[in-house]
Amino acid sequence: MSDTTLSLLSPEKRKALEFAISQIERSFGKGSIMRLGDATSMKVETISSGALTLDLALGGGLPKGRIIEIYGPESSGKTTLALHAIAEVQKAGGVAAFVDAEHALDPTYAAALRVDIQNLLVAQPDTGEAALEIVDQLVRSTAVDIIVVDSVAALVPRAEIEGDMGESHVGLQARLMSQALRKINGNISKTGCTVIFLNQLRQKIGLTYGNPETTTGGVALKFYASVRLDIRRVQTLKKGTEEFGIRAKVKVAKNKVAPPFRIAEFDIIFGKGIANLGCILDMAEEVGVITRKGAWYSYNGENLAQGRDNTINYMEENPSFAQEIEQQVRQRFDQRVALSANTAAYTEEEIGEGE
């Protein structure tokens, strides 16, 4: 509420408002309520996903202090993407935890993705209740920066595990997720911990129209997640007849902190993970940091290499150069976002004047 708006309030209303705010702050702590215009920082902090194309599609990266859902079919890159996010947090000095409900974490592969497995917190709970209680306690500790839960489908309620095979437990997992997320969500926002849930796809039985695909665990996660990423395998990468990776396509199905429905693509190399240098090169060419004439890539008028693979090899041999290019791409992207925001604000002012 601006000073102009406050000045329009009667002295009695203004006094009542200030008293209510002071009472709320006394009961729930300083900062529990504020005028949005008084916030010291309006921009949501982010962490890198490990793929520059996806970071830019997300508006800068994965938001801190939010719930994120990554879903898709099998072997589409869900765990790889989550492990890259963990590696980025650890690289910045943060603490990461992996709740392995599927009991399928491969430490060798995680290490290949530059995850510090010596300091990675890993839990392999037997029940869904135990897994979500572990997540809640880690979040409330305020010491953990990112938690990955792999996966929602493997969060089996205790009643189902202790019951007989074939016994019906309709809606039990959905109720478990709904109760847990109600409890966890507020603490996540306060502590700044990012919680990533990996999820699988299921088919709706008997559906004639619409999308037959749905995710497990009910609708609570769809509601509480600030970001939902739909990841798909769109191409198999080959050298001759030998397969060496996949091309992944990610659609930002939901985004509460930036415009949604953007799409990002990147390569995942078997045994190595996301080929981020390829992402940097593609985005650098798109925003004009690096130019291409024919097969030659050039920077500031100087040729780098001939062909995409050779240019990526050059960037791999010169990491400081690759870092410089990435910074310039992010700066160009931020300038584009600021320009579009200013244009939108100017248009709104014009509309207001016209009225």
From Swiss-Prot:
It is found in: Cytoplasm. One of its GO terms (biological process) is SOS response. ATP binds at G72, P73, E74, S75, S76, G77, K78, T79. GO terms for molecular function: ATP binding; ATP hydrolysis activity; ATP-dependent DNA damage sensor activity; damaged DNA binding; single-stranded DNA binding. The keyword Cytoplasm applies. GO terms for cellular component: cytosol. The keyword DNA-binding applies. HAMAP family: RecA. It holds the Pfam family RecA_C. The lineage of its organism: Bacteria, Bacillati, Cyanobacteriota, Cyanophyceae, Acaryochloridales. This is Protein RecA. Belongs to the RecA family. Can catalyze the hydrolysis of ATP in the presence of single-stranded DNA, the ATP-dependent uptake of single-stranded DNA by duplex DNA, and the ATP-dependent hybridization of homologous single-stranded DNAs. It interacts with LexA causing its activation and leading to its autocatalytic cleavage. InterPro entries: AAA+_ATPase, DNA_recomb/repair_RecA, DNA_recomb/repair_RecA_CS, P-loop_NTPase, RecA-like_C, RecA-like_N, RecA_ATP-bd, RecA_C_sf. It comes from the Bacteria. Keywords: ATP-binding, Cytoplasm, DNA damage, DNA recombination, DNA repair, DNA-binding, Nucleotide-binding, SOS response.
